[in-house]
């Protein structure tokens, strides 16, 4: 069921989405996003850039699934205790949604690092995430840069020296991609993405695509996780699309 709400001339609607049932729909970017921006003309685009891609996701775990607590920057426990694999995956991805027995969730985000109470993840990941600390997130899927929240299938983590936060990119190979959500909703992607996050391993022409609670991305076959397997993207200049995607990545 779709309840369209017109605010000015915003393209976004409220869409029922079971994967985020614990959040008010007004605060859930995926529920608001119709993925219905028009195909761009040459007047809507500027520079073409060559990129290579990986993806990241939001782990969704039980609140008492292990013995490793999430801790804040003051080294205080935040409540959830995860398995080693779950803790390390959460640290690597930068956020985690903790589900309680009623199916309600709370999202925690990367807060920084401190040397106290490290968790040894070196058997799981080559990148050292052992000192990661967390905080409660503002957005239901986690937070990005500059007070942006993450929006599934829209947010890109970029090297901000190459792609400035707030930039909108159009990826032709993404247009028309079909994404089936747990709720049964089928998204037909319009090809537009928003630079709203960063990552320690994201350098130069490497972008990381946020795919929500999915753990893989067969719907985006252009993501090869190989720096030699590139694709083309275009910087978008359409002010309305930029404004709408900025709004989508902002809490209110």
Language-model segments: residues:
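Bacterial N-terminal signal peptides
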Residues: 6-13
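Bacterial N-terminal signal peptides that target proteins for export
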Residues: 1-5
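Solvent-exposed, well-ordered loop and adjacent helix/strand elements within mature globular domains
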Residues: 18-252
């Amino acid at each position: 069921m779709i309840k369209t709400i017109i605010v000015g001339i915003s393209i976004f609607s409220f869409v029922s989405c079971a994967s985020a049932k614990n959040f008010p729909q007004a605060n859930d970017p995926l529920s608001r996003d119709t993925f219905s921006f028009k195909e761009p003309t040459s007047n809507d685009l500027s520079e073409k850039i060559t990129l290579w891609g990986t993806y990241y996701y939001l782990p969704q775990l039980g609140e008492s699934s292990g013995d490793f607590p999430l801790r804040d920057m003051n080294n205080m426990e935040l409540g959830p205790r995860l398995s080693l694999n779950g803790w390390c995956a959460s640290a690597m991805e930068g956020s985690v949604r903790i589900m309680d027995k009623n199916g309600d969730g709370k999202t925690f985000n990367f807060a920084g690092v401190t040397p106290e109470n490290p968790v040894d993840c070196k058997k799981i990941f080559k990148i050292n995430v052992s000192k990661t600390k967390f905080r409660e997130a503002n957005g239901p899927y986690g937070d990005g840069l500059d007070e942006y929240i993450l929006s599934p299938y829209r947010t890109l983590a970029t090297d901000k020296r190459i792609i400035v936060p707030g930039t909108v990119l159009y990826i032709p190979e993404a247009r028309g991609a079909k994404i089936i959500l747990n709720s049964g909703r089928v998204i037909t992607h319009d090809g537009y993405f928003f630079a709203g996050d960063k990552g320690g391993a994201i350098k130069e022409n490497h972008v990381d695509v946020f795919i929500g609670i999915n753990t893989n991305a067969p719907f985006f076959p252009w993501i090869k996780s190989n720096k030699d397997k590139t694709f083309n993207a275009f910087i978008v200049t359409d002010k309305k699309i930029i404004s709408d995607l900025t709004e989508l990545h902002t809490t209110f």
